[in-house]
Every structure is written in structure tokens, then in C-alpha cells.
């Protein structure tokens, strides 16, 4: 499969970087710590814990959230080992963490900010998580945090004006059934390939932990806070085209390879794939709620996540102007955000069959 890493986060450690502007994602990791610990305690076979234990993060970005995720996992494994054997895990287990993301990811910042005093060895694994990136049966627990909503490409026909699948919006809003089906079909194909790859790489009985956002069944993307801000981004780019700051053709050819599936769609895809058993599908109560409805915070947060691939298509200056307009639109239409329907934050625990 050929994949284009359009969604690389803004690297470095500057004020607009993902490293500095991902507190929302980190809050989900903190909210799920106890549930992750219980899930690992209940589902991890102690026989898998030998003198070397491998944890892999797929879609690690540049930190610091990946460090929180893998440390939560290591803490849970050590707690289970200590409780069930009465032994000190530090005497018997060496942990290794594999950090995976596309080769364009800012691995330099990732490794420069590794936590001091960490109790694990670390290695970077560049490559698309839609494909095999590790040897067979080579890791014990994997995690994907806010990376389970990507597709490998834009569905065919979405950007063709002569196609019934023509979508004028930069995202799948959910209001056009044919467009939604095209995105869902592409997401299903990619997710099943991803699950197949992880199933080959996991040891028998190993676990995958998926954390992220999805839609509640029956809710459309543009009805949610996240979808509303995405609409603001698209509207801002269109405004800049009308002002002559960028070309309308560029706006017409810009789409996100992202699909936030409904909860039931995710469950169906995993079950149809058959490589994993769903041990838990938890609805997480996020400490920051769905989003902080502060216009400036919203603009900065979405810039950290989407800014890099908007820059790749339009240039840095257009990207910055677009997010200035996003802040204005969020302020002017704050009631639209307050009246939106909540999305869902989840923790999914999968055991390899």
C-alpha cells in the first residue's frame, strides 16, 4: 500500500508545535490510566511476561504524550507482575519501547525529550502503521493514541466534480450519504489492513490499546465540536481564496484523509476482521470535556494537529492566516459550538486471537 504522510504533526518544541499544544490528547491518557491498568491486569497473560517485554506505540508523533502512554502501560505490567509473583519486576524484566511513525515525523524532538530516569530502552521505527513495520510476534502490548481515525488516501471520486461522490468540503461532514459511504469504505479497508499488520507483529495473546475520538451512533461529524471547527477551517480557506490570498483551485483540491467513524462502525470493522477479540470498549469521561470552547485555544490546538499538512498544500503564510480566521469564526459563532452534539472519547482493548 502506498501512503502519503499528509498528517505529520508540527514538530519541534515551539509554541505552535504538537509537543506544546497537545494537552487535550494528554488529558485523555490521564483519564484512562486506571482503566488501562485494570484492562492489562485482567487481560494480560502472565506467561507473556518474560525477561524482556516489548511495548510499541504506533503513530507516536514527537511527544510528550507517547511517553505518558507507554509509561502507563509499563506501570500496569509491573504492578501485575509484582502482585502475582511477589517479585520485584526491576530485578527480572527489561522493557523496550518502540516508537513508530512516518519517516517525516520529528523523531529528533522525540528522542531529545525522552524522560530522564525512564525504565526502558527505546528505539525509533519509521514507517506507515498501515503496513508491517515490525517482525512477526515481536511485541507484547501496542498502543495507538489519536491515530485510529486516519485513512491511507482520499476516497476515489471525492475530488472529481463530475462524480456523484464530489465533496466540496475538506472533511466528511456526514450529511451526504454517498460521500460518507465512500469514506467509510476506505476507512474499513485501511483499518482491516492495519489490524492484519498488528496481528502479525503481536505475540499470541498480546494486547492492542486504542485511544481516541469517534462519533456516537447516528451523529454526523459536522454536528460535533471537532467537526464544527473543521468546518471553520474550510470556510476560512475559502474566504482567503475570495480575498485572492490563495487560489480557489487549491481549496477545491484540499481534503483530509481522516474519517471519524461511529462507535458501531468501529466495532463492526474489528469484529469482521476477526484477528482480535474486543475485551473492552470504554466511553471515557474527558477531564477537558469535548473541547475547551475558548476560540484562541481551539485555533492553536487545531493548528498543531492540522497545520503541517495545510502548510504542505497552501504554504505556511496561508495556513497562519487561515487559523487567525478560525479564531474569529469560533468567537463569532460560539453558540454553534455550545449547541453541538458531543463526540465520544474511547479506550478499546483488543486481544489477539
Swiss-Prot record:
Q: Establish whether keyword Membrane is in the entry.
A: no
The record's section on InterPro entries has:
MeTrfase_7, MeTrfase_capping, SAM-dependent_MTases_sf
**Any idea which positions bind S-adenosyl-L-methionine?**
18, 59-60, 65, 99-102, 128-130, 145-147
Keywords for the protein's UniProt record, in alphabetical order: Developmental protein, Magnesium, Metal-binding, Methyltransferase, S-adenosyl-L-methionine, Transferase
Give GO BP annotations, semicolon-separated. Answer: defense response to bacterium; methylation; miRNA-mediated post-transcriptional gene silencing; regulation of root development; regulation of seed germination; regulation of seedling development; response to bacterium; response to herbivore
**Can you quote the record's cofactor note?**
Binds 1 Mg(2+) ion per subunit.
| UniProt GO MF annotations | metal ion binding; methyltransferase activity
What up-regulates or down-regulates this gene?
Induced in the presence of the herbivory P.xylostella larvae. Silenced by miR163. Down-regulated during seedling deetiolation and seed germination via light-induced silencing mediated by miR163. Accumulates in etiolated seedlings. Induced by the fungal elicitor alamethicin. Slightly up-regulated by P.syringae. Induced by exogenous salicylic acid (SA).
Q: Which sites bind substrate?
A: 18, 21-25, 146-150, 301, 306
Give the main EC class: transferase
Query: What EC number(s) is this enzyme filed under?
Result: 2.1.1.-
Name what cofactor the protein needs.
Mg(2+)
Positions bound to Mg(2+): 167, 252, 254
The function of this protein is: Methyltransferase that may methylate 1,7-paraxanthine. Prevents seed germination and modulates root architecture during early seedlings development. Plays a minor role in defense responses toward pathogenic bacteria (e.g. P.syringae).
Q: Which family does it belong to?
A: Belongs to the methyltransferase superfamily. SABATH family.
What interactions and quaternary structure are annotated?
Homodimer.
Q: What is this protein called?
A: Paraxanthine methyltransferase 1
Q: Species name for this entry?
A: Arabidopsis thaliana
Gene behind this chain? Answer: PXMT1
Amino acid at each position: 500500500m502506498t501512503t502519503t504522510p499528509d498528517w505529520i504533526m508540527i514538530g519541534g518544541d515551539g509554541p505552535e508545535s504538537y509537543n506544546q499544544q497537545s494537552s487535550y490528547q494528554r488529558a485523555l491518557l490521564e483519564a484512562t490510566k486506571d482503566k488501562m491498568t485494570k484492562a492489562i491486569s485482567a487481560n494480560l497473560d502472565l506467561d507473556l511476561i518474560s525477561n524482556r517485554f516489548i511495548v510499541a506505540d504506533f503513530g507516536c508523533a514527537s511527544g510528550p504524550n507517547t511517553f505518558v502512554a507507554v509509561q502507563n502501560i509499563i506501570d500496569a505490567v509491573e504492578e501485575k507482575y509484582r502482585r502475582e509473583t511477589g517479585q520485584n519486576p526491576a530485578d527480572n524484566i527489561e522493557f523496550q519501547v518502540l516508537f513508530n511513525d512516518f519517516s517525516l515525523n520529528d523523531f529528533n524532538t522525540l528522542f531529545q525529550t525522552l524522560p530522564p530516569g525512564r525504565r526502558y530502552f527505546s528505539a525509533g521505527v519509521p514507517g506507515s502503521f498501515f503496513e508491517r513495520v515490525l517482525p512477526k510476534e515481536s511485541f507484547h502490548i501496542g498502543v495507538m493514541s489519536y491515530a485510529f481515525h486516519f485513512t491511507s488516501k482520499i476516497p476515489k471520486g471525492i475530488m472529481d466534480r463530475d462524480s456523484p461522490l464530489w465533496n466540496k468540503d475538506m472533511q466528511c461532514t456526514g450529511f451526504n450519504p454517498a460521500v460518507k459511504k465512500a469514506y467509510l469504505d476506505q476507512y474499513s479497508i485501511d483499518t482491516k489492513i492495519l489490524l492484519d499488520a498488528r496481528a502479525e507483529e503481536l505475540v499470541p495473546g498480546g494486547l492492542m490499546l486504542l485511544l481516541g475520538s469517534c462519533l456516537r451512533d447516528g451523529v454526523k461529524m459536522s454536528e460535533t465540536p471537532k467537526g464544527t471547527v473543521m468546518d471553520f477551517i474550510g470556510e476560512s480557506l475559502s474566504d482567503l481564496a475570495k480575498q485572492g490570498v490563495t487560489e480557489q483551485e487549491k481549496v477545491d483540491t484540499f481534503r483530509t484523509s481522516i474519517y471519524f467513524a461511529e462507535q458501531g462502525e468501529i466495532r463492526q470493522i474489528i469484529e469482521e476482521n476477526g484477528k482480535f477479540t474486543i475485551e473492552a470498549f470504554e466511553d471515557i469521561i474527558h477531564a477537558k470535556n469535548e473541547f475547551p470552547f475558548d476560540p484562541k485555544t481551539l485555533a492553536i490546538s487545531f493548528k498543531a494537529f492540522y497545520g503541517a499538512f495545510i502548510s504542505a498544500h497552501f504554504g505556511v503564510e496561508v495556513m497562519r492566516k487561515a487559523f487567525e480566521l478560525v479564531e474569529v469564526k469560533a468567537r463569532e459563532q460560539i453558540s454553534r459550538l455550545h449547541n453541538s452534539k458531543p463526540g465520544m472519547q474511547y479506550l478499546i482493548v483488543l486481544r489477539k486471537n
